[in-house]
């Protein structure tokens, strides 16, 4: 398995234009809906191999990066990425620093009241342990009293805290939850023995397991679709159109199959404030 190099921490914004010039066609989204003329500016937290990561040459890679590039191409826009921690993404979207959150943001009704969301992928929560699973974590009850690392501010943190509360309700010890700026730092803490498990998503935990780094000891928890998120209803509708076209010509399935990901099976649509 190829070992991917990726950023351990990203405190500074890094803009990555993927193409030097805009495509020679008519953009499907007006400049008035965009942060930058003829450009689809997307935020990503590239610490989630194989879905989004930075390779040894410093280039953005992964399924969601490829998907964002293809959507931009079909909308006749130049893709550009800003690498940023997840906790800054929703405020940055509101401040018009980027057009689209392309980081696999989990769909929730609360978020859909703030942003236009397009569900496109099914994901779930996993827990990873150190090699050999020394704490013998086999069920969620085995997480009682354990020190667990998770990325700050996301769905994963929320679900980890809910699970900890459910353990307490059963008379078990709560988890000692430690938050980190991103998943890469959380996994580094696991490697260093600072935490006893890490919460992530199925695709990422499976990747670390396949590499032989950290066994995926629990998976498939809290299955929930992940989404694109944007301020603009017009842009969201255009993204749905691009996804529908990819679904119709088979390219969406081919991309997801290549990465072992699961396509959202319900209707592709926009959920958000009118």
Where are these regions (language model features)?
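Extended ligand-binding regions for polar small-molecule ligands
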Residues: 22-24, 65-74, 133-134, 141-155, ...
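Extracytoplasmic small-molecule ligand-binding "clamshell" domains
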Residues: 22-104, 249, 258
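Alpha-to-beta junction loops
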Residues: 41, 77-78, 95-103, 146-147, ...
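Periplasmic-binding protein-like
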Residues: 46, 122-129, 202-244, 262-274
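Short helix-initiation/N-cap motifs at beta->coil->alpha
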Residues: 65, 81-91, 135, 174-188
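Ligand-binding cleft/hinge of the Venus flytrap
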Residues: 68-75, 156-179, 209-210
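Acidic, polar ligand-binding/catalytic clefts
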Residues: 69, 73, 78-142, 213, ...
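A ligand-binding cleft/hinge motif common to bilobed small-molecule-binding domains
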Residues: 88-91, 104-113, 159-166, 188-222
């Amino acid at each position: 398995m190829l070992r991917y190099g990726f950023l351990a921490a990203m405190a500074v914004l890094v803009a990555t234009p993927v193409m030097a010039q805009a495509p020679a066609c008519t953009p499907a989204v007006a400049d008035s809906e965009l942060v930058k003329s003829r450009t689809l500016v997307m935020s990503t937290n590239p610490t989630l191999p194989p879905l989004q990561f930075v390779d040894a040459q410093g280039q953005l890679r992964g399924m969601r990066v490829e998907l964002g590039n293809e959507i931009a191409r079909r909308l006749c826009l130049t893709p550009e990425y800003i690498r940023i921690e997840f906790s800054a993404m929703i405020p940055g979207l509101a401040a018009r620093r980027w057009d689209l959150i392309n980081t696999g943001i989990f769909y929730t009704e609360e978020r859909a009241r703030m942003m236009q969301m397009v569900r496109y992928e099914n994901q779930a929560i996993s827990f990873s342990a150190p090699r050999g699973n020394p704490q013998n974590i086999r069920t969620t009850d085995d997480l009682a009293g354990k020190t667990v690392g998770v990325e700050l501010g996301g769905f994963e943190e929320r679900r980890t805290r809910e699970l900890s509360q459910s353990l307490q309700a059963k008379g078990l010890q709560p988890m000692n939850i430690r938050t980190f700026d991103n998943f890469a730092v959380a996994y580094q803490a696991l490697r260093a023995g600072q935490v006893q498990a890490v919460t992530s998503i199925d695709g990422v935990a499976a990747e670390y397991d396949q590499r032989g780094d950290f066994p995926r000891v629990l998976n498939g928890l809290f299955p929930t679709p992940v989404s694109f998120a944007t301020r603009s209803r017009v842009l969201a509708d255009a993204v749905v159109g691009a996804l529908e076209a990819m679904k119709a010509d088979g390219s969406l399935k081919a991309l997801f199959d290549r990465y072992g990901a699961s396509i959202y099976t319900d209707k592709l649509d926009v959920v958000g404030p009118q």
